[in-house]
């Protein structure tokens, strides 16, 4: 009787599992994509110094649009063609919806408690909805007002330094930092003096480097993860400690403010206020078993500080870099600004932005050549297949937006700065549906702050180019401006841009 019962249970189970096992076997028989041959056990670890967006783009030109690398027992796949990118970001985006976990990511995001690096699932969907609603939606009008006001302050700062060399990197970081702080934390940053700005810059840039570096310790067995031949683990601990104190002070300030203003129902709230309120409600509803904790709040604050500050700042610096290398494009966009806005007014309004066609082309061309995140990080949630190649579960997949934006099969003269290419009615847009141009990603893991970031980018550049003519210091020529990049998850300029503003308006700049 026991044998019969066993058969009754096992036969349906085997009939159910057999097709899945057969499919798994068929997948395993498929080859991996081409790539450089690795050594036994360690794979391609000795090539790790080539694994930035530029080095991977070169390897993809040799091995194709889907490249396979092996680091220890881990598989890495690099996507550098629009067709493969479409498969990853659109057709099978549910399969590639997780984020890879590294020692740096795990430690700097409080164990994956943030939004940007947590895995896809119910928690991620819930947090993204809150994130967008609390900070990035047009209904959250305070976020958009803060952009206008902080841009106007930066214009006044530049106006007070006319004729003097300005560090554009610091100017852009100060602006984007204050926009982010106003939108998320309710007030401009407390790091307004020069020394604190330098300190804040160093922290953000170190985070970017750590998020983007390949760490040998990530690709050895867990019992050997204490090995730190590159010194990255020590840097990770120091970086988190430097930022952790600031984030905790932000939370403490909001908790104290709430106590002081407990009875003031009309008091304006910011993102942190709303996160803390949501956290308290979760505790009540779930009887102290909450789905959102203080680490989640700290992780999201880290996301906003890093993503909201650095990406906009770097984009502003890169667009001015390219404009200074291309005087004819500077003249053309300033002629457009003169025609649309007029030299008798210094404010560029939203109604003007809609008509600044060539300015938008310049911004898109800058994002094509210098995408905010040159490598989009994904991880597979299950085994899958792309173009006849096997991609196993748990693999790291990197979409090389830098390579996509310079693909000669998609772009004519791809290395040249040519904003006019976007005047073509069928030119790619920023909606994430043209996979040769996805600077903010596409699909469910695309950048949630894209709209606010683009608005800040566009408004800042419009004002800087409308109010001032920019020239190079010390007799430099346009050809002397370099485009060498520094290391990091983003693409900072290795040597900060320095430029000299002169007024081009017929009216005074008055900022209330």
UniProtKB/Swiss-Prot annotation:
State where it is primarily located. Answer: membrane
Membrane topology designation: Single-pass membrane protein
Q: Which Pfam families match?
A: p450
Tell me which residues bind heme: 447
This enzyme's EC code(s): 1.14.-.-
Tell me the cofactors it needs: heme
Q: What happens without the gene? A: Deficient in arabidopyrones, but normal amounts of sinapate esters.
Output the InterPro entries linked to this UniProt entry: CYP450_84A, Cyt_P450, Cyt_P450_CS, Cyt_P450_E_grp-I, Cyt_P450_sf
Q: Where in the cell is it found?
A: Membrane
In UniProt terms, what function does this protein have? Answer: Cytochrome P450 involved in the production of catechol-substituted substrates needed for the arabidopyrones biosynthesis. Converts p-coumaraldehyde into caffealdehyde.
Record-given protein name: Cytochrome P450 84A4
Instruction: Identify the species of origin.
Output: Arabidopsis thaliana (Mouse-ear cress)
Report the gene name: CYP84A4
